Amino acid sequence: IRCTGSKECYSPSY
């Protein structure tokens, strides 16, 4: 799981 500097976490699914 990745989290951006904003406040969003998501799985590496591009």
UniProtKB/Swiss-Prot annotation:
Similarity section? Belongs to the short scorpion toxin superfamily. Potassium channel inhibitor family. Alpha-KTx 06 subfamily.
Its function, per the record, reads: Blocks voltage-gated potassium channels.
Origin, by domain of life? Eukaryota
Per the record, the domain comment is: Has the structural arrangement of an alpha-helix connected to antiparallel beta-sheets by disulfide bonds (CS-alpha/beta).
Q: Does the keyword Disulfide bond apply?
A: yes
**Record's miscellaneous remark:** This peptide elutes at 19.98 minutes.
The GO cellular component terms are: extracellular region
Sorted alphabetically, which keywords does the UniProt record give? Disulfide bond, Ion channel impairing toxin, Potassium channel impairing toxin, Secreted, Toxin
What Gene Ontology molecular-function terms does this entry list? potassium channel regulator activity; toxin activity
Where in the cell? Secreted
Output this protein's name: Potassium channel toxin alpha-KTx 6 OcyKTx4
Query: Where in the body, by tissue, does this protein show up?
Result: Expressed by the venom gland.
